[in-house]
A protein has these predicted regions:
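Alpha/beta-hydrolase fold nucleophile elbow
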Residues: 83-93
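Glycine-rich nucleophile elbow surrounding the catalytic serine of serine-hydrolase chemistry
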Residues: 91-103
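Alpha/beta-hydrolase active-site loop
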Residues: 62-82
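The feature captures the conserved acid-bearing segment of alpha/beta-hydrolase catalytic domains
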Residues: 121-204
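Cap/lid segment of the alpha/beta-hydrolase catalytic domain
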Residues: 52-65
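Short, surface-exposed "cap/lid" segments of acyl-processing enzymes
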Residues: 1-46, 55-57, 144
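Short, surface-exposed basic-aromatic patches at helix termini and helix-loop junctions that form
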Residues: 79, 102-109, 162-165
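A conserved short beta-strand
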Residues: 107-122
Length: 204
């Protein structure tokens, strides 16, 4: 198995939760196994996968051991999600970018992203994927969390990244005065958010 993938299988093959790690391969400050164990505690019956970008390049160089670019990753994930009735992509920061990107390309049911980057200025990256506004679709439900305490507009976590894509009717922008996924997890807020998303009707 690739060191870029961690997974826990459930018994319910209707629902798949896919998480994309961000900076230092974590979701916020939560390590992969810890986040997967939390999801398993909340949703023991569902299949769960956690991908890591060891290249730390917004997944543009692929997932090590699996793919080498965005197109290959899309094809790979297309096979992974096939057969599930509900698919949720989750990510934070660069992982949020990946959740939106691949969730859009694959038209998954839902994307949950915390302080995601939606515009990338790095000119070494494939140009058509630098602005997610040009990639997002009209069928996926996007739940995007912005942190209003980040004041520097050049910061990767500035709310301007949410503003860039919030005009889509299928985007729900949620603004918080500080975002800590650890605190959201420990308070039960994160579980409630995910439960409410998964309670939405499946695509026909």
């Amino acid at each position: 198995m690739s060191t870029s993938l961690f997974e826990i299988q459930g018994t319910n093959k209707d629902v798949l939760i896919v998480t994309f790690g961000g900076c230092m391969s974590k979701v916020g400050r939560i390590p992969p196994f810890e986040f997967l164990n939390t999801l398993t505690k909340w949703f023991p019956d569902f299949d769960k996968k956690f991908y890591i970008d060891l290249h730390q390049c917004w997944y543009h160089k692929g997932i090590q051991g699996i793919s080498t670019n965005i197109a290959e990753t899309k094809t790979y994930l297309e096979g992974i999600i096939n057969g599930y009735k509900k698919v949720l992509f989750i990510g934070n920061s660069a992982g949020g970018y990946a959740a939106i990107l691949f969730g859009s390309l694959l038209h998954v049911q839902s994307v949950l992203a915390f302080v995601p980057q939606t515009i990338l200025s790095n000119t070494n990256l494939e140009i058509k994927y630098r602005n997610l506004k040009n990639i997002m679709n009209t069928t996926t439900k996007y739940y995007l969390y912005g942190d209003t305490t980040v004041k520097n507009i050049h910061d990767h976590h500035h709310v301007s990244h949410i503003e860039n894509v919030r005009n889509f009717q299928n985007v729900q922008a949620i603004y918080k005065d500080g975002i800590s996924l650890q605190e959201m997890r420990d308070s039960g807020e994160l579980q409630t958010v995910i439960v409410n998303i998964l309670d939405q009707p499946a695509f026909p």
